[in-house]
Amino acid sequence: MRIHFLLFALLFLFLMPVPGNGGIINMLQKSYCKIRKGRCALLGCLPKEEQIGSCSVSGRKCCRKKK
């Protein structure tokens, strides 16, 4: 019976999300950026673009062409 508890605990640890990797939040922010006609930039927006939001918790920026 102890082996079942140990296996369950190990399975739980491996399936737990990594801290700082907000998978669902990142996906929603990325989708919202695409809906607003933007793109996700890794470092920053290009000179002819403006920042309209963020694409992830880690700091990617959502950019689109200036109007």
Curated annotation (Swiss-Prot):
Subcellular location per the Swiss-Prot or TrEMBL entry: Secreted
Keyword Cell division included in the entry's annotation: no
GO biological process, alphabetically ordered: cell chemotaxis; defense response to bacterium
Keyword field: Antibiotic, Antimicrobial, Defensin, Disulfide bond, Secreted, Signal
Presence of the UniProt keyword Transcription in the record: no
Main localization category: secreted
GO cellular component: extracellular space
SS bond list: C33-C62, C40-C55, C45-C63
Signal peptide coordinates: 1-22
GO molecular function: CCR6 chemokine receptor binding; chemoattractant activity
Functional note: Exhibits antimicrobial activity against Gram-positive and Gram-negative bacteria.
Family label: Belongs to the beta-defensin family.
Name of the protein this chain belongs to: Beta-defensin 103A
Originating species: Equus caballus (Horse)
